[in-house]
């Protein structure tokens, strides 16, 4: 499931219902701006899911943008908007998620997902995927004759 910004109550309720049906832990990864609203949006998602699915094993992790990424990648910052009601106590400059290269974001998501797959299973899935691509190319080429 993907949500942008603050997730709606309906979305969170549906997500919590789904998570409640799982027999395995749920891993929720958050990517958002590093500013008062972006950080708060992630916190609210985490709180709401735990409240709506109290018996579920939920692991929440913000994978972008983090203070460590800002420093390591020298991401461009901007002054935090003082007009944001959540700015009090946020004593850092802000960084937009868009400051991270799209390929880097894909890699962050890929790595987060790979942590949960047995290495052998990933190799098998990649081989099956490549085989399917080859078959599709064959059919496309045959259809164009």
Label the predicted regions:
Residues 6-9, 34-38:
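Short acidic, S/G/P-rich loop/turn micro-motifs used as interaction or catalytic elements
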Residues 20-24, 48-58:
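Arginine/glycine-rich "motif VI" loop of SF2 helicases in the C-terminal RecA-like domain
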Residues 1, 29-31, 61-63:
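Hydrophobic/aromatic beta-strand patches that form the interior of the parallel beta-sheet core
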Residues 25-37:
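Acidic beta-strand-to-loop metal/phosphate-binding motif
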Residues 11-15, 38-45, 73-75:
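A short acidic (Asp/Glu
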Residues 57-145:
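C-terminal or mid-to-C-terminal helical accessory/interaction module adjacent to the motor/catalytic core
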Residues 1-24:
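Acidic, glycine-rich catalytic loops of TOPRIM or P-loop NTPase phosphate-binding modules used
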Residues 6, 18, 27-29, 90, ...:
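Sequence-level detector for tyrosine residue identity
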